């Protein structure tokens, strides 16, 4: 089974267990699409997905970017299971060094990220990050198993600002 959608071929070797996730931003002219990367990772798709939803790692793994080392306690997720997987929502503190001001649209040294995270069966995720400025940064991850020890990660994102506001190559 192969379907062309969102600029990619979506393949299921057997009958698909779920539909391809709906990504409304893809066809909405108010959003710009940025294809970020397509990489092979030496891990399983379930481990990568688990990490995607683990907000306790931000202060440690992302300390050079948005992690706040002085606030290592993870924020509480509100989790809702649904027919396509689950939806999890939280608000976190995020470091916002000057080099990230254009990404967040915020000038403060520490800001917040309202994170709306969704898991779609079997191996996809959507992370909608909203900053206090109203800037939204929606990340799509698709994790494709290759073998028992590796997977292919495809990531692209959507932003509701302009290239002049925040260049895609930042």
Regions inferred by a protein language model and the residue ranges of each:
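Active-site-proximal cofactor/substrate-binding loop regions of enzyme domains
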Residues: 1-10
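C-terminal catalytic domain of Rieske-type non-heme iron oxygenases
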Residues: 17-170
């Amino acid at each position: 089974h192969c379907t062309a959608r969102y600029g990619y071929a979506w393949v299921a070797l057997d009958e698909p267990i779920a539909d391809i996730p709906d990504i409304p931003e893809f066809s909405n002219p108010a959003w710009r699409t940025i294809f970020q990367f397509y990489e092979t990772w030496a891990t399983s798709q379930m481990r990568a997905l688990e990490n995607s939803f683990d907000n306790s790692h931000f202060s440690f793994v992302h300390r050079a970017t948005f992690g706040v080392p002085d606030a290592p306690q993870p924020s509480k997720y509100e989790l809702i299971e649904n027919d396509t997987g689950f939806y999890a929502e939280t608000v976190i503190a995020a470091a916002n060094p000057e080099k990230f001001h254009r990404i967040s649209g915020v000038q403060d040294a520490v800001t917040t990220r309202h994170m709306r995270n969704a898991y779609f069966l079997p191996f996809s995720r959507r992370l909608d990050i909203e900053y206090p400025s109203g800037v939204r940064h929606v990340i799509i991850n698709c994790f494709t198993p290759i073998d028992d020890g590796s997977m292919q990660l495809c990531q692209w994102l959507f932003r509701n600002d302009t290239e002049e506001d925040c260049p895609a190559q930042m």
